[in-house]
């Protein structure tokens, strides 16, 4: 709401105000003849836009010569002019409905020192309106004001005109007798505002609004809004409001989630945004001491400053923020640590006493961070303690885009980003990447661009900065190089199908299609957050390769394979913990696939006896039936060659669907041999006949043996297509193969 300006812009000479007392009026002064040019039609107001910075009310003064305008020191500083300078001045005509509905002013002393004052907001508002009514005030403008013998500087922090859209221009308005004025003062100013009602007092924060991207926080808008509502909304209001509501401030919050998602960053930025004491940042293990009682004293010392302020200042005390990184290191469940000292139990007791004890502090905000919430003592998580618990999870695609924009912002500003960069595509490609991993991708991409400008033969060669360009190809290389901790284990899955996938006939194709329907069901259904499928069949029939192919083709962000080969030599309890961790990690991803390969091997099954691990069996049965958290979806595939055993122990009943993966019949084997093209056309039928009812894995092994030739050295020519496998040698290999494997 800019108003209208006079058609004529004057250039006037800046002078001092005629007398010291006029400096406190916030008026500008000029000659009587010049004053007429700034008259607002239909009123007795004289308004001028000075240097396109702010609007001042003018008054005529006999000592001011024509062509001069008198400004006080504060006004000259705001207009960035000195006495004797020329400044542009034009008439300002306010638009309709220009009266201020609400005005927020920050108070500070003109002479800063150790003096402290208590200011009555109601009396100051009355005095201010008496002197400043019908003046136009602009956000950012400063004015000097004398109140009860003390000189103050007023800074306009907010100017709200009813119905005005702040996005359309500068925030300003006309002070009227109906304007509601809110006064603010920083804790360091020495000014205490009393008798102020009905309006929020936002001096708890250093800034009046938050731009999370400028703080380096991306993809956490919803989480930050939740934190603000629950932990800070009550602190924004004056103490008497919360007192009348009968509520207590939140004293603690817990940020938990996977590593690298921004928990520490958010806690640090929250600490920086708050007015008051600098936050105390404590890494969990730093509190511990080898001396008896010293650890508990270290905890008490963290709260010492807050206790002192509470005693001396009461409700006016500054907020003290204490940030505990890796809080699970010192606040484990009481009784879980068997070190004989009980020091971890004492730490929990000491924290509970300080936060929520008999003499609990009301000026403390404790922020804890952990990726192992399950290790914390339950008493810490109850209301009154770390009651606000916010999960900082892996960012979604929109969040990843914000994070990439933050980390590439400087590159873009300095023209280092190539024109082919598509951040939206990169965000789509980086599923389940944490914020830290996305930063790693940007660093890796930058390293490729920088490396192109270096010569290994002469590292002292000057670098031409304008040639540094980070391209889309650099980012694609970086994505391949930096793998997410909670992503799909593509390399592990590819190792499960080293020979690729061939068409094994309609029976295998049917199983693949039915399994992909389960994938689609998990993706779109709101009623099936957990789907489980068991692939059973003879050893070597391709169950693991089929499951791995489904995992790769599913395009799920998290695909993990659990096999006995990664747990060789581990105890039963350690194996259980490993399996549980894989499931817990899967719950952190929106959609996940877990492949339990060779379940009988995981259970340490031996047919003689029989023997198996009951602990692992019970763990699997619980996990296969446990629903993932709300909003998360999980698909579990299991493979086994001992389905009868799994039926006897009840594990097969935990799977919703069971598919039998068969051996290859003659027609299937012929189809495979035709695709491999290693036999002559005349020999394919004979070879397929011999391979009837054989698993695909054994077929591959047999063909590998036959491809070596009778005297060895034939494999290269055969795979290159220059020669074919000799059918007689193939039969010889088949006889040996059956004798040794059958």
From Swiss-Prot:
InterPro entries documented for this protein: AAA+_ATPase, AAA_lid_3, Asp_de-COase-like_dom_sf, ATPase_AAA_core, ATPase_AAA_CS, Cdc48_dom2, CDC48_domain_2-like_sf, CDC4_N-term_subdom
EC assignment: 3.6.4.6
An example Gene Ontology CC term for this record: plasma membrane
Binding site for Mg(2+): 544
Domain of life: Eukaryota
Keywords for the protein's UniProt record, in alphabetical order: ATP-binding, Cytoplasm, ER-Golgi transport, Hydrolase, Magnesium, Metal-binding, Nucleotide-binding, Protein transport, Repeat, Transport
Similarity field: Belongs to the AAA ATPase family.
Protein name: Vesicle-fusing ATPase
Biological source species: Arabidopsis thaliana (Mouse-ear cress)
Lineage: Eukaryota, Viridiplantae, Streptophyta, Embryophyta, Tracheophyta
């Amino acid at each position: 709401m800019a108003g209208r300006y006079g058609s004529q812009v004057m250039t006037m000479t800046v002078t001092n105000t005629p007398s010291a007392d006029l400096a406190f009026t916030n008026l500008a002064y000029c000659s009587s003849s010049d004053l007429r040019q700034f008259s607002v039609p239909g009123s007795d107001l004289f308004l001028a836009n000075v240097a396109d910075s702010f609007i001042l009310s003018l008054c005529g003064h006999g000592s001011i010569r024509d062509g001069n305008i008198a400004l006080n020191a504060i006004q000259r500083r705001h207009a960035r002019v000195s006495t004797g300078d020329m400044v542009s001045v034009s008439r300002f005509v306010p638009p309709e409905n220009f009266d201020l509905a609400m005005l927020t002013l920050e108070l500070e002393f003109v002479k800063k020192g150790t003096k402290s004052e208590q200011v009555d907001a109601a009396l100051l508002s009355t005095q201010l309106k008496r002197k400043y009514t019908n003046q136009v005030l602009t956000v950012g403008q400063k004015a000097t004001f004398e109140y009860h013998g003390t000189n103050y500087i007023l800074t306009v922090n907010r100017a709200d005109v009813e119905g005005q859209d702040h996005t359309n221009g500068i925030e300003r308005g006309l002070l009227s007798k109906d304007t509601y004025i809110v006064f603010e003062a920083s804790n360091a100013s020495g000014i205490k505002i009393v008798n102020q009602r009905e309006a929020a007092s936002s001096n708890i924060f250093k800034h009046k609004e938050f731009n999370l991207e400028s703080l380096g926080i991306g993809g956490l808008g919803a989480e930050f809004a939740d934190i603000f509502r629950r932990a800070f909304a009550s602190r924004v209001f004056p103490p008497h409001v919360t007192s009348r509501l009968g509520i207590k401030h939140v004293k603690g919050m817990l940020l938990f989630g996977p590593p690298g998602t921004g928990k520490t960053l958010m806690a640090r930025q929250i600490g920086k945004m708050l007015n008051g004491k600098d936050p105390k940042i404590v890494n969990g293990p730093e509190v511990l001491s080898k001396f008896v009682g010293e650890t508990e004293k270290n905890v008490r010392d963290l709260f010492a400053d807050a206790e002192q302020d509470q005693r001396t200042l009461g409700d006016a005390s500054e907020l003290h923020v204490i940030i505990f990184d890796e809080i699970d290191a010192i606040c484990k469940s009481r009784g879980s640590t068997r070190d004989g000292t009980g020091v971890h139990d004492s730490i929990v007791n000491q924290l509970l006493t300080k936060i929520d004890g008999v003499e609990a502090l009301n000026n403390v905000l404790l922020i804890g961070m952990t990726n192992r919430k399950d290790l914390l003592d339950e008493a810490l998580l109850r209301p009154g303690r770390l009651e606000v618990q916010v999960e900082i999870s892996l960012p979604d695609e929109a969040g990843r885009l914000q994070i990439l924009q933050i980390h590439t912002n400087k590159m873009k500003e300095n023209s280092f980003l190539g024109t082919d960069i598509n951040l939206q595509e990169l965000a789509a490609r980086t599923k389940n990447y944490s914020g830290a991993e996305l930063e790693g991708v940007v660093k890796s991409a930058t390293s490729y661009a920088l490396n192109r400008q270096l010569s290994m033969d002469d590292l002292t060669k000057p670098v031409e900065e304008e040639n540094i360009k980070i391209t889309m190809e650099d980012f694609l290389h970086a994505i391949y190089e930096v793998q997410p901790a909670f992503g799909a284990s593509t390399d592990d899955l590819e190792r499960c199908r080293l020979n690729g996938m061939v068409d094994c006939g309609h029976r295998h194709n049917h199983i693949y299609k039915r399994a992909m329907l389960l994938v689609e069901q998990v993706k779109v259904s709101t009623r099936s957050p957990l789907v489980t499928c068991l692939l059973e069949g003879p050893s070597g029939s391709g169950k693991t390769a089929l499951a791995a192919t489904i995992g790769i083709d599913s395009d799920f962000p998290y695909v993990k394979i659990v096999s006995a080969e990664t747990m060789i030599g581990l105890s039963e309890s350690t194996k259980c913990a490993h399996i549980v961790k894989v499931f817990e990690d899967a719950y952190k991803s929106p959609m996940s696939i877990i492949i339990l390969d060779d379940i009988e091997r995981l259970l340490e099954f031996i047919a003689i006896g029989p023997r198996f691990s009951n602990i692992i069996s019970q763990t699997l049965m619980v996990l296969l039936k446990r629903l993932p958290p709300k909003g998360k979806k999980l698909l579990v595939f299991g493979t086994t060659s001992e389905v009868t055993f799994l039926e006897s122990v009840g594990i097969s009943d935990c799977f919703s669907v069971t598919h039998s993966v068969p051996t290859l019949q003659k027609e299937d084997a012929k189809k495979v041999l035709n695709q491999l093209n290693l036999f002559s056309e005349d020999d394919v039928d004979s070879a397929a006949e011999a391979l009837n009812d054989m698993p695909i894995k054994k077929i591959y092994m047999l063909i590998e043996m036959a491809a070596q030739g009778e005297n060895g050295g034939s494999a290269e020519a055969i795979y290159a297509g220059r020669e074919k496998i000799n059918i007689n040698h193939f039969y010889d290999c088949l006889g040996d193969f059956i004798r040794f494997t059958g």
